[in-house]
C-alpha cells in the first residue's frame, strides 16, 4: 500500500 501512496505523492 505504501507503494501506492508514493505513486500519488
Curated annotation (Swiss-Prot):
Pyrrolidone carboxylic acid: residues bearing it: 1
Keywords for this protein: Amidation, Flight, Hormone, Neuropeptide, Pyrrolidone carboxylic acid, Secreted
Single Gene Ontology MF annotation: hormone activity
Domain of life where this protein originates: Eukaryota
Any GO BP annotation: neuropeptide signaling pathway
GO CC field: extracellular region
Classification via InterPro entries: Adipokinetic_hormone_CS (IPR002047)
Main subcellular location of this protein, as a coarse class: secreted
Glycine amide modified-residue sites: 9
Protein location: Secreted
Record family assignment: Belongs to the AKH/HRTH/RPCH family.
Function: This hormone, released from cells in the corpora cardiaca, causes release of diglycerides from the fat body and stimulation of muscles to use these diglycerides as an energy source during energy-demanding processes.
Protein name: Adipokinetic hormone
Organism name: Helicoverpa zea
Amino acid at each position: 500500500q505504501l507503494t501506492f501512496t508514493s505513486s500519488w505523492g
